[in-house]
Design a protein with these regions (language model features):
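Non-catalytic structural scaffold of enzyme domains
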Residues: 1-235
Length: 235
């Protein structure tokens, strides 16, 4: 079978390594095409909302990847749900939102006899509103009674950008330890994936599942394109 070409569209350089590392570990046969426009996150933080001009830029990136022969497109920027939906409508290949697969896995933990309590941690504050809406909509569609708690981890992303990954991980873990009781913790940004082990160690006495987006996304794309997913997992 011909190796699939997966377009990875980023709005921050911090997301590039986590998803490429997951592909190398889980699906090394895939050919990854990375496109980065790091001004998108800057502009969203400045404007406070997703504008028509930003959506058009996403469409332009999508059209480029399709012209380059992409078999699937994965967006790694978690604050641009509406723009990604617009791109999916103009694509003839699978298009995946960054957290869609992780949300599906979290919702699979739901039980009929009680609410599913989910904690969503984010280091990029503008992403919380759109991600919360997306998760709530997915839960509603599945008739799942969801209790969602969100928390922003300020300055953690800046520490990561400055090269202090351990401080970034520690801040996320400290915030996780202060959360109310829940059934699962979700790490919102792709750039948070490397903090998963630190968070799990901080919560080791609770056996609480901690999910990150990159691994879930790779596995979902494998399934969408009909490739074998029975391989070693790093999630």
């Amino acid at each position: 079978m011909k190796p699939p070409r997966i377009a990875l569209i980023h709005a921050t350089p911090l997301a590039v390594s986590p998803i490429n590392d997951s592909f190398k570990s889980l699906w090394p046969q895939a050919i990854c095409q990375n496109l980065l426009d790091d001004s998108l996150s800057v502009d969203l933080a400045r404007d406070g909302e997703l504008t028509e001009a930003m959506i058009k830029r996403f469409l332009n990136l999508t059209h480029y990847t399709l012209s380059a022969g992409a078999d699937a497109i994965l967006f790694t920027c978690s604050a641009f749900g509406v723009a990604i939906e617009a791109c999916a409508k103009e694509s003839n290949v699978p298009v995946l939102k960054p957290n869609e697969a992780m949300f599906d896995e979290a919702l699979s933990l739901a039980r009929t006899d009680k609410k599913l309590k989910v904690a969503l941690l984010a280091t990029f504050n503008p992403s919380i509103a759109s991600m919360s809406e997306e998760l709530n909509q997915m839960a509603k569609a599945k008739a799942i009674d969801l209790d969602l708690v969100t928390a922003h981890v300020p300055v953690a992303m800046q520490h990561l950008a400055n090269g202090d990954a351990q401080k970034h991980h520690d801040l996320i873990a400290q915030t996780a330890a202060q959360l109310p009781p829940c059934d699962v913790i979700l790490l919102a940004q792709f750039s948070m994936a490397a903090a998963k082990q630190t968070v799990s160690e901080k919560l080791k006495n609770s056996n609480l599942p901690v999910l990150s987006s990159p691994v879930c996304a790779v596995q979902a794309l494998q399934k969408a394109l009909g490739f074998d997913t029975h391989i070693d997992q790093i999630n």
